[in-house]
């Protein structure tokens, strides 16, 4: 009898804790690319919602501020840019009794890239955040960006893969690239990409044209949209602050391969992975003559020679660095190895990693990589090797 009494008390206590709580469920409450941006308000604290868990529970008194950012945008229900949902009973509702799952914007919410007061790359660059401006105030970040504020070629981005919600992400589709910080600069970059073959028509490598129908520069996302859950957050990855010029067959080859492997691993382990992705050194056809999209003597949008991706399990702190040679013409790519290749130790057996046209790729320990390339923050902590 005493045991039964104890169980009844426990059940009653648990039910009392649940009463009044509300939750956001992925994907039910954030369907479609027109889902609004969600800010979570607890007391005086307002934060951008991050879709880390399939179900995120909030205490009584929590409010959600829904926003449809971007010029001319607004909620389909009332045309307003923002509305507030309160936790009533066990679900979030507006004053008009609208539910979160029924709310959508007239068009996709637009993100912006905002400069912070922090510095990066050994204090050479500013750190930026991708996020949203709501009622004149910035909320971030969807991901972080370290770059010079003009062109992304030697900086890096920092993002997360949420393994517990990754399989519920909005399906990918291509969007137009843009520059939220300088729209004209975005248009200029569009033109540089579109007219590249004409610009480089006289540039040869190994006696052949540098660019042709198979080998050309594409807009390479450092933080990939395939790692992002919601529509508005995905669109933010098309900002040119997140784009580096990479050879198309390499970006679609091994760079895509290990990113996809990593996303699937996060899903399998239901883990959260932290990523740092960047480029370094400049691609050259002739020594000391770096190649840039503008094909100028001193290019402003340089093509990186290498692309790297550091992946760290946020719980175990195990990590690995993928390093890809962004040069489909290199005749002896192994001579460019920056560290000991430990792919086999990480249970990675990808024959295409040695295919130079798909991007010659090796795996490095973080310590080995960090001894050669000192671009990342010094406070990154990696304990062991992340195995696949």
Swiss-Prot record:
Cofactors required: a divalent metal cation
Presence of keyword Transcription regulation: no
Residues linked to a glycan: 260
Nuclease as UniProt keyword: yes
Predominant place of localization: secreted
Superkingdom per UniProt: Eukaryota
Gene Ontology MF terms in the entry: DNA nuclease activity; double-stranded DNA binding; double-stranded RNA binding; metal ion binding; RNA endonuclease activity; single-stranded DNA binding; single-stranded DNA endodeoxyribonuclease activity
BP GO terms, sorted: apoptotic DNA fragmentation; digestive system process
Pfam family, one: Endonuclease_NS
pH-linked activity: Active from pH 5.5 to 11.0.
Subcellular location: Secreted
Reported consequences of knocking out the gene: RNAi-mediated knockdown results in impaired blood digestion observed as an increase in nucleic acids, hematin and protein contents in the intestinal tract after blood meal.
Sorted UniProt keywords: Endonuclease, Glycoprotein, Hydrolase, Nuclease, Secreted, Signal
Signal peptide start and end residues: 1-18
Tissue: Saliva (at protein level).
EC number(s) given by UniProt: 3.1.-.-
Gene Ontology, cellular component aspect: extracellular region; mitochondrial inner membrane; nucleus
Main EC class the enzyme belongs to: hydrolase
Family: Belongs to the DNA/RNA non-specific endonuclease family.
Function: Binds double-stranded DNA (dsDNA) with high affinity. Binds double-stranded RNA. Binds single-stranded DNA with lower affinity and with a preference for purine-rich sequences. Shows residual nuclease activity for dsDNA. Facilitates blood meal intake by lowering the local viscosity created by the release of host DNA.
Name this protein carries in UniProt: Salivary protein Tsal2A
Annotated gene: Tsal2a
